[in-house]
Amino acid sequence: MSSEEKLAAKVSTKASDVASDIGSFIRSQRETAHVSMRQLAERSGVSNPYLSQVERGLRKPSADVLSQIAKALRVSAEVLYVRAGILEPSETSQVRDAIITDTAITERQKQILLDIYASFTHQNEATREECPSDPTPTDD
């Protein structure tokens, strides 16, 4: 096997692993939301057979399809993009993860909360840089 064939096989295996991971994640989110596959297909505008193939890891959905599925499941499209390998994961934060995965709030509300949180963390970081001897930010 040539080096090009080995590389192609490795890329193909990685792509199928990603497809399987995103599929199982979508399935778990769907089951957590108590939504049938048919209901999710209907809500997201994706055919039932295609959604089934995605969940089983046989097809890797496009960013548009992931966005539609995310909206139908009321989860962040960013989470699905990262799982699918479309986006690189951003800085780890328990608060950020909690906001993104919360199904009780809308995508718009999630984005507003994330923006506010980012603003506070950047402000606190700037304060720490100005006063490195003070380990905790002040309450202004």
Curated annotation (Swiss-Prot):
The keyword DNA-binding applies. Residues 26-80 form the HTH cro/C1-type domain. One of its GO terms (cellular component) is cytosol. One of its GO terms (biological process) is regulation of DNA-templated transcription. PANTHER family: HTH-TYPE TRANSCRIPTIONAL REGULATOR (PTHR46797), METHYLPHOSPHONATE SYNTHASE (PTHR46797:SF1). InterPro entries: Bact_TransReg_Diox, Cro/C1-type_HTH, Lambda_DNA-bd_dom_sf. Was identified as a high-confidence drug target. SUPFAM superfamilies: lambda repressor-like DNA-binding domains. Residues 37-56 bind DNA. One of its GO terms (molecular function) is DNA-binding transcription factor activity. It comes from Mycobacterium tuberculosis (strain ATCC 25618 / H37Rv). Keywords: DNA-binding, Transcription, Transcription regulation. This is Uncharacterized HTH-type transcriptional regulator Rv0474. The keyword Transcription regulation applies. Pfam families: HTH_3.
